[in-house]
């Protein structure tokens, strides 16, 4: 049973979300708002009933059984998000069942590094740590002068921060922030205006907000000067 068979009027990609806790529900609802066709799966009847109020395709099923997933046509989905977190056994068995069903790309939520390692070894192509990522983000916002912070797996980060005093009234080329701090200013926003892409000729004014990218340690050091 495949709810999203290929056809001229159907989406090019299909996505299934397994586990409809807070994280899974947020992922499924966000994907739906973005215009994607989403199949949501959970084994708890009360959760399925509640999710049916906001999602079009919701199925009650035991995702740890590969035969059940095969019946749902899970192997024909382009992406499957395993959003089961606290029940580690169910999380691992679901990833294994997805792998056995031939899912091409498996995203899985992990609650810690050891859980993530097991998921990778079981067949997950991508592992995310939403609680850790949010904790890291909030820690940077609370302890530093950043307005926003996003870190990637490879030690690369993007931050939103106020313009440092040394750059005000100068072009980015004149202030030489890149050579001094090893970061790249990719966008500048004046109060009340939209962000614009930064160039060496962009003039930084007092009150401007900068979008800066670079190695995590370098953008942290740069943000501390603002």
Language-model features, listed with the residues they occupy:
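Cytosolic regulatory regions of ion transport systems
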Residues: 1-226
């Amino acid at each position: 049973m495949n709810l999203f068979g290929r056809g001229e009027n159907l989406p090019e990609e299909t996505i299934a979300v397994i586990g409809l806790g807070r994280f899974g529900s947020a992922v499924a609802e966000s994907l739906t708002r973005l215009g994607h066709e989403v199949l949501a799966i959970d084994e708890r009847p009360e959760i399925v009933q509640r999710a049916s109020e906001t999602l079009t395709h919701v199925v009650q099923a035991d995702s740890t059984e590969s035969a059940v997933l095969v019946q749902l046509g899970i192997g024909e989905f382009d992406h499957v998000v395993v959003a089961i977190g606290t029940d580690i056994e169910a999380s691992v068995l679901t990833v294994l069942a997805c792998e056995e069903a031939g899912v091409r790309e498996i995203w899985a939520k992990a609650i810690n590094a050891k859980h993530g390692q097991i998921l990778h070894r079981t067949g997950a192509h991508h592992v995310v740590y939403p609680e850790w990522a949010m904790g890291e983000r909030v820690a940077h916002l609370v302890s530093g002068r950043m307005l926003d912070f996003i870190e990637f797996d490879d030690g690369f980060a993007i931050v939103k921060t106020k313009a440092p005093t040394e750059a005000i009234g100068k072009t980015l080329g004149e202030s030489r922030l890149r050579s001094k701090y090893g970061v790249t200013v990719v966008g500048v926003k004046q109060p009340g205006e939209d962000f614009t892409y930064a160039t060496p000729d962009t003039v930084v004014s007092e009150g401007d907000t900068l979008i800066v990218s670079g190695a995590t340690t370098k953008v942290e050091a740069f943000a501390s000067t603002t």
